[in-house]
Swiss-Prot record:
Subcellular location: Cell inner membrane
Protein name: NADH-quinone oxidoreductase subunit A
Transmembrane stretches, start-end: 14-34, 67-87, 97-117
Protein's UniProt keywords contain Glycoprotein: no
Catalytic activity: a quinone + NADH + 5 H(+)(in) = a quinol + NAD(+) + 4 H(+)(out)
Organism: Rhodopseudomonas palustris (strain BisB18)
Length: 129
């Protein structure tokens, strides 16, 4: 279908795509650099907190169990992406593909049970093991 609309070599099409993508990115960065508000005395090494200076310097490491939950979400979200790809090719994969998918799900369920028993999913106030 692509040859009907634009008879072009696939390598040239890739080069055009990369060049246009890089040009769009450069244009967006250039427009942002021109239009941004320039402030005298702005410190680029301080975090942005709604336009005000930070209240106090950090007092040490922060307890942030959210990052653990986010990492677990990313790990187990990949399971869904892989299983969606398997579902598309389930007929061609046959019984072997079904068994492989079941083993994959089983390993991830074992990992989830291990994390649950280990207390990695307990992120409220309370005792951890």
């Amino acid at each position: 279908m692509g040859d009907f609309l634009f008879p072009i070599d696939s390598g040239a099409a890739l080069a055009i795509h990369v060049a246009l993508s890089a040009g769009i990115v450069a244009a967006i960065i250039g427009v942002a650099a021109v239009l941004r508000e320039k402030r005298a005395g702005a410190r680029p090494d301080t975090p942005y907190e709604g336009g005000v200076l930070p209240a106090a310097p950090p007092q040490g490491p922060q307890n942030a169990p959210y990052f653990l939950i986010a990492a677990l979400f990313v790990i187990f979200d990949m399971e869904a992406a892989i299983l969606f790809a398997w579902a598309v090719a389930a007929r061609e994969a046959g019984w072997v593909g079904l068994i492989e998918a079941a083993i994959f799900i089983g390993v991830l369920l074992l990992a989830l049970v291990y994390l649950w028993i280990d207390g990695a999913l307990d992120w409220g106030p309370g005792e951890r093991k």
